[in-house]
Every structure is written in C-alpha cells, then in structure tokens.
C-alpha cells in the first residue's frame, strides 16, 4: 500500500507549493496543513470558513491498535499511513497576552494535540524533525560543532560587555562584523507606519564603535571579517550537496551580507569532497536531512563556515525548467512512500 506525504508549512510558501505539485504529478498523495492557523469554533460565517480550516483530530490508543486521523479543510488525513513529512513550519498558533483564559487554554490544547499527533507518526521519515532542529538552530551551537568537526570557522565572540567587544574588534586586522544572534524579525505598527526591527550582518564601523556601550543591553555576536571572493551556499539534501557560488562581491551593498541584494548572479560550485564529507557528518550528528549552509570562499580559496539554516530556501538558486535541488527533495521524499 502506498503511503502519503504530509507537508507542514505556512499556507503561502512557494517551496511547499513546489514540492506538493511535483509529488502529486508523480502520482503520490500529498496533504498540507499550516500548524500556525487557529482551529475555528463551530458556527462560522461562509467567509470565515473560507480561510479557517475545518479541523478535527481523532487519536485513539488501545492495547491492540493505534488509530490517528486529522480532518483539515476538505482533507481527511490518515496519520497512520503517512510515510514522509516535509516540514517547513512547526510554529503553532498563539494568542495575545490580553486574551481571556479560555482562549489561552484552547490554544495550549491545540498545540499539545497537534504536537502529540505529529510525534506519534510511527516509522515516518522527516525532513526535518523539528524537535531536533531546535537544539541546533543556534549560531553558538553551530559554531562549536563546526569547530569540533574540523570546519574552518571565523573567530567569534558573543558578549554584552563593552570592554570585551571593543578589545575583540580592535584585534581583528581585517575588521569585524556584528550579527543578530537570534533569527527573530519584529514589526512595530504602533506609529501607524510599519517599522522592521532586526538587522543584517554589518561591519563594525568607527561610528558604531562610538555606540558600543549599547551591547550591554543584550548579548551580541561579533566575528572577524572574512575577505572573500564569493559567498557559497551549500544546500544539503540527504547525502547530496548542491553548491552555488554567489557573486556577493559584485555589488557594494552585498559585500558583507548577500541578503541585501535580491538579483545577484550565481553559478554552480564544485564543493570540495573533504569539506563536504565533514559537513555531511556534522548534519547527520544533528539528525538533519536538509540544510542550507553558508560559507565564505576566501581569496586563498579556503571555505569558512558561517551557519546552517535547517529550513532554508533554495528556489532562488534554481531555474524554472532546471531544478535539481527540488528534484532531489521530491525523490528522497517519494522513496519513502512506496513501501
């Protein structure tokens, strides 16, 4: 009996769309749900029913059997017949602090029920298991592990001490950069005009040094700046690496952080076998089947590891008719559905 694919993703996610479409084109059954959407109460208007899911969980356990199913919109998902999960989003719906206690309880029970149903998908292949992502989705943990496995890494300091930060910056002969330690991005609408909080990787300038006392408010991540020829994105799918060189040095805005430009040229890159094996071994130790990993290619052709995004994007590196990363993701997921 063929098993089905379950995709956990936000409703508007082109990467989830691409995987779903290609899997179904190959004759497999694929279901989608967004864990971050609130389960609605009964008695909704027609308009509300269009965008809130009709959600119903059935999970039972006896001495003889385990039965689990989920109805989501018009999908009735037999969770005991899921062979693989493609997980892009495992954040759950939350309620504001000002909400009544009844809604807090409802949301807590929604999270616990859906989390439990996902954790009890027996014998299921995950790309990736989100409960394994959380412990390693941290720049400090990744830096430590990269060092342990033998990848080249930049000198790094995490501190909220102005004196320590200043000494570190002054010791970096090629300059220093500052990075956001967390991945959070916040939008403040209180003024009527949305303001985004969070920052790109940036050079610590002379002007920034004048305000270095501000690091005392929270830990900040400093690294030595790495002069580079290009940024290298190594997208790992299972035991395969798809590497691209990004022409980040071709534009002033993207020299330090290529995310500042959206139309940079890229080309496939011959990733060194030894470094590739080291990277794969590190990701396997984390239990990851997918990661988008960022390196610098230095001017003397060394690869320096920066970080791994375990839910990173890849379609921006691929063409409409040539998409080897997408093909490999779908091939790996589909191979788990034919048992």
Question: Across the structure, where does each feature detected by a protein language model lie?
Answer:
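Extreme N-terminal starter segment of soluble prokaryotic enzymes
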Residues: 2-6
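Conserved N-proximal alpha/beta basic substrate-recognition cap immediately N-terminal to
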Residues: 10-22, 33-152, 166
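Phosphate-binding site of ATP-dependent enzymes
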Residues: 23, 170-271, 277
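A generic structural motif
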Residues: 26-31
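A short linear hydrophobic-aromatic micro-motif
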Residues: 155, 220-221, 290-293
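C-terminal active-site "lid" helix and adjoining low-complexity regulatory extension at the edge
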Residues: 266-277, 281-288, 297-339
């Amino acid at each position: 009996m063929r098993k089905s694919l379950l995709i956990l993703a936000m409703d508007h996610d082109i990467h989830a769309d691409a995987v779903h479409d290609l899997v179904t084109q190959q004759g497999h059954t694929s279901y989608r749900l967004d864990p971050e959407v609130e389960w609605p109460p009964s008695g909704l208007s027609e308009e509300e029913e269009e965008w809130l899911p009709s959600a119903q969980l059935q999970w039972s356990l006896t001495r003889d059997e385990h039965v689990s199913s989920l109805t989501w919109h018009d999908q009735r998902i037999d969770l005991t017949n899921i062979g693989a999960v493609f997980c892009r989003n495992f954040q759950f719906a939350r309620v504001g602090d000002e909400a009544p206690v009844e809604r807090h309880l409802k949301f807590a029970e929604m999270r616990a029920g859906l989390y439990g149903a996902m954790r009890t998908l027996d014998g299921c292949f995950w790309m990736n298991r989100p409960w394994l992502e959380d412990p390693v989705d941290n720049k400090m943990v990744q830096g430590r592990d990269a060092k342990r496995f033998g990848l080249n890494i930049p000198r790094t300091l995490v501190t909220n001490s102005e004196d320590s930060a200043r000494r570190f910056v002054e010791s970096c002969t090629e300059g220093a950069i500052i990075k956001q330690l967390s991945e959070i991005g916040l939008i403040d609408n209180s003024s009527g005009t949305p303001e985004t909080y969070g920052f790109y990787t940036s050079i610590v300038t002379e002007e920034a040094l004048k305000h270095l006392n501000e690091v005392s408010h929270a830990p900040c991540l400093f690294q030595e700046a790495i002069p580079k020829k290009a940024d290298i994105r190594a997208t790992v799918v299972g035991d395969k690496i798809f590497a691209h060189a990004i022409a980040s040095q071709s534009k002033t805005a993207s020299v330090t952080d290529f995310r500042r430009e959206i139309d940079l040229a890229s080309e496939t890159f011959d990733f060194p076998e030894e470094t590739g094996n080291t990277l794969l071994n590190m990701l396997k130790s984390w239990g990851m089947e997918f990661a988008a990993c960022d390196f610098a290619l230095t001017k003397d052709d060394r690869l320096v590891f920066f970080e791994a995004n375990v839910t990173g994007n890849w379609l921006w590196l691929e063409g409409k008719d040539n998409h080897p990363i997408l093909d490999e993701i779908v091939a790996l997921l589909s191979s788990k559905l034919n048992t």
